[in-house]
Amino acid sequence: MGTGKKEATRRAKGGETGNGFGNIRVKGVNFYRDAKKVKKLSMYKEGRAKHNARGEEVQAATFQSKEIPNARIDPNRRWFGNTRVIAQDALNHFREALGETKRDSYQVLLRQNKLPMSLLEENNKIPQVKVVETESYANTFGPKAQRKKPQLAVGDFAELASAADESQQDFEAKKEEDNSWKVDGWSQEAKEAIFHKGQSKRIWNELYKVIDSSDVVIHVLDARDPLGTRCTSVEQYIKKEAPHKHLIFVLNKCDLVPTWVAAAWVKHLSQDYPTLAFHASITNSFGKGSLIQLLRQYSALHPDRQQISVGFIGYPNTGKSSIINTLRKKKVCKTAPIPGETKVWQYITLMKRIFLIDCPGIVPPSQKDSETDILFRGVVRVEHVSYPEQYIPALLERCETKHLERTYEVSGWSNATEFLEKIARKHGRLLKGGEPDESGIAKLILNDFNRGKIPWFVPPPQAEDMENVKFAAGEGRLGEMKKREIHEAPAATETAEETKEEEFKGFDD
């Protein structure tokens, strides 16, 4: 009896189920080949056609029958409907209107019809066609010309000259971009590891996560140097890979520059994307209402979505987290006057339909930027820089002497060494033997430079239409350029000229 119990237990553990007749061979059934295997082997035999004794084909091979099968057209009313056609003139007009609309940064595409847009858009790339080999000059322009009219892209010599100029400009821009690392035949200089901050794979992964999760992307720029803190490569990526996402420029720290400088930069950047001037402060902000109103408009453009996400990208230390705190009226993101405070992306709820995404600062690699440019943009922390006194001469060239004299209450220096020595002796920063602590004072000055205690800014480009447009001081908002443009107004012109000619005295601490 004990043996029987063990045998029953062993069978149960072995997984044997059923009545025990599963492995019994039935007569007439192939035991070694199943139906799938038999079908596969028969397919190998059917590969050739069958012929009779006279060599005539009796049965065609698989998929090689010459008999036409009976076809049947799907009954659909669209076969009998009108066909939509368009003339060439109307197509050209539509193509021009489409191009003008795409170039306008203040127009948004709400709905797109099912049209072959690839056929309507003009391809900027020149196809690699060997025209001379396919159509010779004699067959095109000579007495034996076979075409009535040569296929030219221009109509007269003026258009040909303008097309040649545009082609030359594009070629020079591309050449400068490709050969930016070649400077007078010298090779690229090795940079310190600290100047490669913001370029790690982790930071780029955070950036791509923010871009993929955002419906509206806000590019935060520093009002003192907007072009220096502009990520052109990220803009091109969004324009190419995600054209359905909306991009906005926010000119932060506009309180550190004069009003006419901020207004000129807003007008210049508005040619590419919608631009707003902003001052991040929980208690005393500027541009907050305009930004929230703009986000509400983008939210209204997508009524089918329950909410939209707004991502903040840009260089480190440009004030992305501070703008989010300003919009929420409380500290929801960790901020600091040093770069690299935000490590990972963070979701913040602004309202029921709008969410904000904070992103770490990104620094696109560029061979044109020197170590001085990277340091002055606030990308790296000054305390980690070796020999900070070597950057003081460039700082003296970028800042005016009167601003430095008023900030540090020293005067009468001829070079950077004397400037550091005077400030060190005034503040009592001396080493053994009465030697001035140049390194410590240089770090102090660089921190003041990045944090806005020393007034400086990059002048805006003087556009051709800027001469006829004046900005009245103290009227409207910087984001609303149409309300601030005053044409042929004598009183406003005099006020603007007085404001621009007035000496910029800096800012109070």
Swiss-Prot record:
Q: Where is this region: Disordered?
A: 1-22, 480-509
Q: Which InterPro entries match?
A: G_CP_dom (IPR030378), GNL2_CP_dom (IPR024929), GTP-bd (IPR006073), GTP-bd_ortho_bundle_sf (IPR023179), NOG2_N_dom (IPR012971), P-loop_NTPase (IPR027417), TRAFAC_YlqF/YawG_RiboMat (IPR050755)
Compositionally biased region (Basic and acidic residues): 1-14
Q: Which Pfam families match?
A: MMR_HSR1, NGP1NT
Cell location: Nucleus, Nucleolus
Q: Which GO terms of the cellular component aspect does the record hold? A: nucleolus
What's an example GO BP annotation here?
ribosome biogenesis
Domain of life assignment:
Eukaryota
Identify the SUPFAM superfamilies for this entry: P-loop containing nucleoside triphosphate hydrolases
Which residue intervals define the domain CP-type G in the entry?
204-365
**What are the alphabetically sorted keywords of the record?**
GTP-binding, Nucleotide-binding, Nucleus, Ribosome biogenesis
Q: Which of this chain's residues are annotated to bind GTP?
A: 314-321, 358-362
Any one GO MF term held by the record is: GTP binding
Q: Which family does it belong to?
A: Belongs to the TRAFAC class YlqF/YawG GTPase family. NOG2 subfamily.
State the protein's purpose.
GTPase that associates with pre-60S ribosomal subunits in the nucleolus and is required for their nuclear export and maturation.
Q: What protein am I looking at?
A: Nucleolar GTP-binding protein 2
Lineage start: Eukaryota, Fungi, Dikarya, Ascomycota, Saccharomycotina
